[in-house]
Amino acid sequence: YERSDIKTREIEGLEQRKGFLTEPFDTDIQIVENGVKYIVDLENGQKTGFFLDQKENRAAMHRICKGMDVLDCFTHTGSFALNAGIAGAKSVLGIDVSQHAVDCATRNAELNNLQDRVKFEKHNAFDVLGDWSREGKQFGVVILDPPAFTKSRNTVKQAIRGYKEINLRGIKMVKEGGYFATC
């Protein structure tokens, strides 16, 4: 299955393509990484459906999440949240603005029998982190894995402001002595 359907292909003068290269098959596939099972949606997931470049960062969650309350922002498939759950986190909340992502992450929690400790909710991280901070809500581990805020040089300054703002909001959510991870 080919996923060459990102906007930057047009900027580079390449056509966008998406579809089967072989006979059709179920595009929801199961993979295992760091002992965590995932159903990855190749056809409708963000970009390729799963971000393999974050494998080591997800594995690092196993060292810091045991016994902690964890917040995973921009959760997508729930990969950081699920690693926190497998590592023995007391509770994990993953949030994403996409209901499709929340549904996929919830399905992955069930696949790993983590649904009692690992929950997912639909929220805009920019909005909810400010709200929760004002309410005094905090977590032992806060993970931010936001999408790219820029695709061109013209918007780099805006992107820097966006990263600064979301990281400041995330840091305010960390309990004293806790951990803040941003990718």
Task: Kindly label every feature range from the protein language model.
Residues 1-50:
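Non-catalytic substrate-recognition/targeting regions of SAM-dependent transferases
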Residues 52-68:
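Conserved alpha-helix/loop element of class I SAM-dependent methyltransferases that forms part
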Residues 61, 84, 170:
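Class I S-adenosylmethionine-dependent transferase superfamily signal
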Residues 67-76:
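Conserved class I S-adenosyl-L-methionine
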Residues 77-90:
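Conserved SAM-binding loop of SAM-dependent methyltransferases across substrates and taxa
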Residues 91-96:
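Conserved SAM-binding motif I beta-strand of class I
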Residues 100-143:
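S-adenosyl-L-methionine
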Residues 125-183:
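S-adenosylmethionine
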